[in-house]
Amino acid sequence: MKMHPIISLIILSVGFSQQLPKVVETYKNGNIRNITFHKETQTGIEKDKYEAYHYTGRKASEGTYLNGKEDGLWTYWYENGQKRWEGTVKNGQRNGLWTYWHENGQKGSEVTYTDRKEGGLQTKFHLDKECWNEDGNVCECGQYWWEGCK
């Protein structure tokens, strides 16, 4: 009969072991600098998710981990709250389409990464939409700066 409390204790400890504490670092002003979430795996404890914050408290970045390496969607923000860049990471390396924005929120470029290198389609967006015709006069740009005047 004494075995039941021991078995209950083991079952309780295994059941609660999935809820691992998050690690929180703060700035001197008390605001959160970053939060690292962990999970228990067959090989031990490893990072699961990461969030970083600007000194002011706004979110700076977030992403996920797999097998201890960055993996999945990663997003970064400017301090004003606008997206800075976003894309997918696989096994710790950029992979697939990454989108970059200017601080004012306008899209700056799209780059496709293959085998850890920029490759494939790359699209750059003109920030101020100022184009010139053959005579040197300013005109309204097409959708992309390289299209020239409308």
Annotate the PLM regions.
Residues M1-K2, Q18:
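Absolute protein N-terminus
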Residues K2-L9:
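Sec-dependent signal peptide recognition
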Residues L9-S17:
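Hydrophobic h-region of N-terminal signal peptides that target proteins for export
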Residues F16-Y78, Q82-K90, R94-H102, Q106-K150:
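Periodic aromatic/glycine/histidine/acidic cluster detector
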